Swiss-Prot record:
Residues 115-154 form the Pentapeptide repeat domain. GO terms for biological process: response to antibiotic. Disruption phenotype: Decreased resistance to fluoroquinolone antibiotics ciprofloxacin and sparfloxacin. InterPro entries: 5peptide_repeat (IPR001646), Pentapeptide-BTB/POZ_domain (IPR051082). Belongs to the pentapeptide repeat protein family. Keywords: Antibiotic resistance. Each subunit forms a right-handed beta-helix with 8 complete coils that stack upon each other. This is Pentapeptide repeat protein MfpA. When present on multicopy plasmids confers increased resistance to fluoroquinolone antibiotics such as ciprofloxacin and sparfloxacin but not the quinolone nalidixic acid. Forms a structure that exhibits size, shape and electrostatic similarity to B-form DNA; it may bind to DNA gyrase which is postulated to protect it from fluoroquinolones. It holds the Pfam family Pentapeptide_4. The keyword Manganese does not apply. Transmembrane segments: none annotated. Homodimer. Probably interacts with DNA gyrase.
């Protein structure tokens, strides 16, 4: 761990934490580089204005945590659970959320382009106007997820996505339009 010259920036690099209880700690403006957190509890933690590069948050708990104004670049949030968190605005660049639980989270207008969200629970999540270009949502649970006016172009999804998520006004590509039609029982024929 290094403390910045002005005393307000803490940098953690190449460290590992397993089962660590960070509950209610102030980790705002922290910077992590290649740090691995396994089964850590971040409940009530303030991670606002933090930066994370190549770090992994594996099976961690985020309950009533604050991560707004933070940046996650090439991070793994595999199996982590987010409940009642203040998330947006936030930046995620090529992050892996496989098996994470984001059900009920407010992700309006968040850019999740190129992120992996395989088998993620987005049940009841609010992703209105979110950008999910080229994201991988295969196997994700999206019952009652709000994706109205979201940008879904190039996103990989299962057929059930089109019948369970609310997608009115979403931007989709031609291939997705055909998948949407097929999922709703329409027979699409050329000419």
């Amino acid at each position: 761990m290094r403390i910045g010259a002005n005393g307000d920036e803490t940098v953690w690099a190449d460290e590992e934490f397993a089962g660590r209880d960070f509950r209610d700690e102030d980790l705002s403006r922290i910077r992590t580089e290649r740090v691995v957190f396994t089964e850590c509890d971040f409940s009530g933690v303030d991670l606002s204005e933090s930066e994370h590069h190549g770090s992994a948050f594996r099976n961690c708990t985020f309950r009533r945590s604050t991560i707004w104004h933070s940046t996650f670049t090439n991070c793994s949030l595999l199996g982590s659970v987010f409940t009642e968190c203040r998330i947006r605005p936030v930046t995620f660049v090529e992050c892996d959320f496989t098996l994470a639980v984001l059900g009920g989270c407010d992700l309006r207008a968040v850019d999740l382009s190129d992120c992996r969200l395989r088998e993620v629970s987005l049940v009841g999540a609010d992703l209105r106007k979110a950008v999910l270009r080229r994201a991988d949502l295969t196997g994700s649970r999206v019952q009652d997820a709000r994706l109205e006016e979201a940008d879904l172009r190039g996103t990989r999804v299962d057929p059930t996505f089109w019948t369970t998520a609310k997608v009115r006004g979403a931007k989709i590509d031609i291939e997705q339009a055909l998948a949407y039609a097929a999922a709703h029982g329409l027979a699409v024929h050329g000419g």
